[in-house]
Amino acid sequence: MLFDQIARNKRKTWLLLLVFFLLLGLVGYGVGNLWLGSGFGGLILALVIGFIYVVTMIFQSTNVVMAMNGAREVDEQTAPNLYHVVEDMAMVAQIPMPRVFIVDDPSMNAFATGSSPKNAAVAATTGLLAVMNREELEGVIGHEVSHIRNYDIRISTIAVALASAITMLAGMARNMMLWGGGRRRNDDDRDGSSGLEIVFLILSLIAIILAPLAATLVQLAISRQREFLADASSVELTRNPQGMINALLKLDNSAPMQHHVDDASAALFINDPKKESGLQKLFYTHPPISERVERLKQM
């Protein structure tokens, strides 16, 4: 089952790349048509920006994500309890020892990042370390180590990179609309516009407006099942389902994180870091804690 999931995650990586780059291309086409005088030129520019974001995140994902979340690296001397739990879980999972970080925040949360098990990292908040006992902490870290072992972190890294690129490009386009409007075409340009070009332009304008939401929905589509699998994989590592259940119940009562969490990286956390309510719940990248607990009870 595990190796099948790893293979599926690798296939999802390519599908994720395709969906995000298609969305980037639409946004770029709209930007090019409206402001650069060439839809194709804008499309190429957007794809180049997306490629740069992905390459940067693949090689610098740990440093970038940790900096985004204000995490500091620790070792066996400065955080022995966390370090030893990560070390134990990595040994059981048969992966290289990840780098270990702490986020100074009173809420309870944790996440993993990196592009492969060889350059992965795990982070936990000070609030998590203060509240969780050893068994619960093992459950949480086992969950994050499972993301590393199952290659979920590669999907997450690419998702963060491309979602950030889409949000940045769409934000720039919307600001240009507000401040300057589109490039004015002369009558000859309008008369020569093909029906297909107009269709692409309309789709691009829609993409510019809805791109950040679409990026979130793509992350949502790939995130929820990964969380269920990581919960189950954590129990496989710890042989202690009750420890994972107790940890999830505590996470359910945690307050939102106090420091700002970028929308693109929110899906990395074991627990929703924003604790939003109302209609925003529809766009959670995490399944409900109650559902995760119920699945563990059925194991």
Curated annotation (Swiss-Prot):
Subcellular location: Cell membrane
Coiled coil regions in record: none
Keywords: Cell membrane, Hydrolase, Membrane, Metal-binding, Metalloprotease, Protease, Transmembrane, Transmembrane helix, Zinc
Cofactor(s) needed: Zn(2+)
Highest taxon in the source lineage: Bacteria
Transmembrane segments: 14-34, 39-59, 153-173, 198-218
EC number: 3.4.24.-
Active-site residues, record numbering mapped to chain: E144
Keyword Transmembrane helix assigned: yes
Name recorded for this polypeptide: Protease HtpX homolog
Protein species of origin: Streptococcus thermophilus (strain ATCC BAA-250 / LMG 18311)
Gene behind the chain: htpX
